[in-house]
Each structure stands twice: as C-alpha cells, then as structure tokens.
Amino acid sequence: MSLAPTFAVIAAVLLGGSDFFAARSARSTPSLTVTRTAVAVSVLLSPLSLLVVESKWTARDSVIGALAGIAMITGLMLLYRGYKVAPMGVVAPIASVLLAAVPVVWDVINGVRTGPTVAVGMALGVVALVLTSYTPGGEGSATLGAALGLSSGIAFGVAFTLMGEVSKGAGMAPVIVQRSAGLVLLLVVWLVRRDPLIATGPGLRYGALAGVLGLTAIGHLQMAFQRGASGPVSVASSQFATVAVVLAVLFNKERMRWWQAMGVAATAVAVALIALGS
C-alpha cells in the first residue's frame, strides 16, 4: 500500500490543529496578523526539515514551490475576507469542496485514473467536507460569500495541484520556498494595510503553535503528493476541517450539530476507502 494516504491523513490532523490554534489566536489578534505570525515561525523553522528529509534544490521545483505559496496565502486572505463579509455557512463549504476538486480535475485532464474504491472514497470525502464545514446563520451577502468561497477554493486547489507537480527527489526544498514566498506576500500586504505586523501576548503563543503545526503539516502534505496522485491526496488531506471541528467541540465546548457528526463519520469512511484503494 502507498504511503501517500498515510502522509495525507497526518497532514489533515496537523492542519486541523494549526487551524484550531490560529482561531484561538484570532480571538485577540487580526486574522492577517495571525497568519503572518504563523508563516513567519514556519519560515524560521523550515530549514530544519532538510535535516529530516533528503532534499534537492532545482529551479523548476523552487518556482513551483513559490507559486504554491503565493496561491495558498491568496486563498487564505480570500477565505478570511469571506468570513468577514458573508455567512461562514456559505463561504466554508464552497471553499472546502473546490480545494479538493481542483486537483481531482487536474488528474482527470492528465489521464490519471483511480480505482472504484478510491473514487467512492473521494466522492464521500467531498460530501463530508460540506457536512462538517456548514454552519447556519450569519450576516452579510450570500452572493459575495459564494464568490469569495469560490475564488478561495480555487486558489487553495491550485496550491495543492502545484504541490503535486513537485518532483519526489526535491524533498522539503520546495516547502521552504513555499513558506518564504507566502511570507513575502504577507509582508507586501502589511506594507499596504499597516495592520499589526506580528501577534503579541496570547495571540503570539497560539500563532506560533499554529506555525509549527502548519509547517509540519505542509511537509507531510508535500511527501504525500510526491508519493501519490493529486486527487486522492487532496481529498484525504482536506479533511482537516473535520479535525478542526472535533477539536473545537472537545476544547472550546462548542456544540457539534447532527450533520457535522455525520460528516465526521463520513470522513473516517472516506479516508479508509482511499487508503484501501491506494
């Protein structure tokens, strides 16, 4: 059995944890400042990944890594903007589904075919994303929220697709470039907006934790893409939304709605099917 699903699931768990701590930090700190803090920490620590995984620097993989980093941060900024001006229940499901769908479409275009078990797992995984990320209520424009969710999901999907184009021998080198390019974009945004550069107090602590987990997650995600098809890996790793919901229920005492519970169960089955068929 391929190690790709294993790395993808580890990435999903770590991304969910990173998202959870970023949300904690955002209680006292602007979301872009939290993101900048987390990415800065990940950039500082990213060279350590070269000690763990044998890596090779190439111009092609470095360019792909930089483009993936820019796309990922663009997706985050569009997502946060969507959360600010529209109901989360509109923005999140659309972004989550497209995040997973874009790499699947790319696989189809390139003639990559999956077995029936993996295909069912991927379809169920997309359903699970909608169930776990949907929350009712909220204020703002549903139309604008849908547009921002759509653009955010496409940006994330492009980032994931680009990560799938990195050569296996590159190891963690593209991850370092990806994180660095993302930080450069965030610094450019800071020069324009002049919001707080780095989080302070509790926001700094939680933001730093989000950065550590985020870097580790992206490293595992890159290894997953280097070992498997983009579609199954993207669907399995995108289940981090489920992890974030479970952590919020366990530690923030948030209520899990019945459809979210169904989504959690669907996630478990979907990941199992993808792993069995890979």
Label each residue range with its predicted role.
Residues L79-T117:
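Membrane-interface helix-loop-helix junctions at boundaries between adjacent transmembrane segments
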Residues A101-V105, T114-Y134, W259-S278:
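Hydrophobic transmembrane alpha-helices of multi-pass small-molecule transport proteins
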Residues M1-L15, E54-M72, G111-V127, L150, ...:
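Structural signature of hydrophobic alpha-helical transmembrane segments
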Residues T33-T37, V90-I94, P116-A119, A173-V177, ...:
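Signature of the 12-TM Major Facilitator Superfamily
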Residues M1-V13, G17, F21-L67, L76-A86, ...:
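Membrane-interface interhelical linkers
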Residues A40-S46, I94-V108, A181-L185, A217-H220, ...:
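Alpha-helical transmembrane segments of compact multi-pass small-molecule transporters, enriched
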Residues T143-A173:
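Selected transmembrane alpha-helices and immediately adjacent juxtamembrane segments
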Residues F7, L14, F21, V41, ...:
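Hydrophobic residues within membrane-embedded alpha-helical segments of Major Facilitator Superfamily
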